[in-house]
């Protein structure tokens, strides 16, 4: 009889022995195997990763500088059947620590040998290359043990004579110098670039300001053009409004003038009727005293004259202000005045001597007043004459000289008036 043994993927099961002196060995990992009682042997070996920390103290480099180097290595037993068999031959029955010690000693030996061939700068500055070189040199040796180096890295490198620190200071100084130079060059380039950027910014700003000014100027010009156009349209509208208003006022004034013309025509007609009525009244009252009739006619004539003068002055002022529109009124008024004067002249001509006598009688009181004006200051008149006939002759002489005086003052020849002619003739 026997047992069925199982194993996980992190271990390898080795079954050896058997009946009839068999030397067959079975290597199983991550599976199971059958082992006979008493005649089969089963052992296990770990396939897990083993972490090693090789350390080489005071190992002289190619330049004779003693360095201490520490590293970290990850190793494991390989699972290929041949290599697993090799590993089992060498490490089966040993603990993991024993296996780690064997591999560690191997790695440290190779690490020491490689340190002796390199300079401090090569080791310190290119640790990856150093670790790669150790891995490449040690891999064949540990591979013959069935061990695989998964990774190897240099953990630390230092010395006890401050060689690395001095090297670091020199390098630091070089780096600091290069950094200062780089900073200065960067600042120089930054200053140049900043100046260029400022120049570009100012150029852009000036271009933008120029475009803004051009846009503003174009806006102002367009605004002025619009304002000018609006002002022109407003002025045209205002002018059209004023012209239309003037036309309307002219029409209104024309209508007023026409109304005034009609009124004047009616007034002329009324005056003509008045003249006819006066004519009839004169015919009806021809026997009335000539003095009263003449005085009335004179007063009417004087009032009409003053009235016509004032009307003519007012109309002349109107005509002057309203221009050609009043020309028709002047013409109508002239015609009306001429018609009135014509009618009046016809009336005077019709009445003949009676009308002239009325004018003379109307003028005689004023003439007498002018002649007698100096006598208003005389208190009394004494006629010195012893003969009454002489006084009479003096009166007759004055009457005889009266027509000449009237003719000289008024231009009216009293000697041609029959009544006066008779009076003066009788005196003579």
Swiss-Prot record:
CDD domains: SPFH_flotillin. Pfam families: Band_7 (PF01145), Flot (PF15975). Disulfide bonds: none annotated. The keyword Lipoprotein applies. One of its GO terms (cellular component) is plasma membrane. The modification Phosphoserine is found at residue 405. It comes from the Eukaryota. It is a peripheral membrane protein; Lipid-anchor. A lipid is attached at residue 2 (N-myristoyl glycine). It is found in: Cell membrane; Membrane, Caveola; Endosome; Membrane. A lipid is attached at residues 4, 19-20 (S-palmitoyl cysteine). Keywords: Cell adhesion, Cell membrane, Endosome, Lipoprotein, Membrane, Myristate, Palmitate, Phosphoprotein. Belongs to the band 7/mec-2 family. Flotillin subfamily. This is Flotillin-2. It comes from Bos taurus.
